[in-house]
UniProtKB/Swiss-Prot annotation:
It comes from Misgurnus fossilis. GO terms for cellular component: mitochondrion; sarcoplasmic reticulum. The lineage of its organism: Eukaryota, Metazoa, Chordata, Craniata, Vertebrata. The gene is s100a1. This is Protein S100-A1. Keywords: Calcium, Cytoplasm, Metal-binding, Mitochondrion, Repeat, Sarcoplasmic reticulum, Zinc. SUPFAM superfamilies: EF-hand.
Length: 95
């Protein structure tokens, strides 16, 4: 298994680990999203001083406004964070 295939598998497993806790097992509720962010992206969450960060992320991700985040909506968050991390990495390499 390549590194990229392994990363994709990890994304899928992480999503379903959290999405299967309550309600629709293929979507993240607000509580499941918060749990995922705290468990998997705690450094990112801690860096934000905004107490409404989870609500804002949920609102931004929930494109169809159903109050839940499906896998496709979740991957948008991961992609955006990855782009931001890459930009930071490139800047740090320049210095």
């Amino acid at each position: 298994v390549s590194q990229l295939e392994s990363a994709m598998e990890s994304l899928i497993k992480v999503f379903h680990t959290y999405s299967s806790k309550e309600g629709d097992k293929y979507k993240l509720s607000k509580a499941e999203l918060k749990s995922l962010l705290q468990g998997e992206l705690n450094d990112f969450l801690s860096a934000s001083k905004d107490p409404m960060v989870v609500e804002k992320i949920m609102s931004d991700l929930d494109e169809n406004q159903d109050g839940e985040v499906d896998f496709q909506e979740f991957v948008v968050l991961v992609a955006a964070l990855t782009v931001a991390c890459n930009e930071f990495f490139i800047e740090s390499m320049k210095n």
